[in-house]
Amino acid sequence: MSSMEGSVLKYPEPTEGSIGASSAKTSWPEVVGMSAEKAKEIILRDKPNAQVEVIPVDAMVHLNFDPNRVFVLVAVARTPTVG
């Protein structure tokens, strides 16, 4: 019988907004309703190596997973005008 038989390995429980045992933040519900610029600022404060992409809410997005990419989806609130 090996010394590992019958042993139970315990791993840290994942925290909210993390993947696996990582403590890296993966979502920012607190920025909902903020301007894209303010949301990007907060995301970069939490995850400085993030590539933050500001895109329209109905835009097509990349299907490949990139752990450093964060999408900030925005909607135009008023009609853009010249002047």
From Swiss-Prot:
Region Disordered, residue ranges: 1-24
InterPro entries named among the record's database cross-references: Prot_inh_pot1, Prot_inh_pot1_sf
GO BP terms in the entry: response to wounding
UniProt keywords, alphabetically: Protease inhibitor, Serine protease inhibitor
Domain of life, source organism: Eukaryota
Pfam families: potato_inhibit
GO molecular function, one term: serine-type endopeptidase inhibitor activity
Positions bearing the site annotation: Reactive bond for subtilisin: M34, S35
Site (Reactive bond for chymotrypsin and subtilisin): L63, N64
Matches recorded under Gene3D superfamilies: Trypsin Inhibitor V, subunit A
Family the UniProt entry places it in: Belongs to the protease inhibitor I13 (potato type I serine protease inhibitor) family.
Role played: Inhibits both subtilisin and chymotrypsin.
Descriptive protein name: Subtilisin-chymotrypsin inhibitor CI-1A
Protein species of origin: Hordeum vulgare (Barley)
Record lineage: Eukaryota, Viridiplantae, Streptophyta, Embryophyta, Tracheophyta
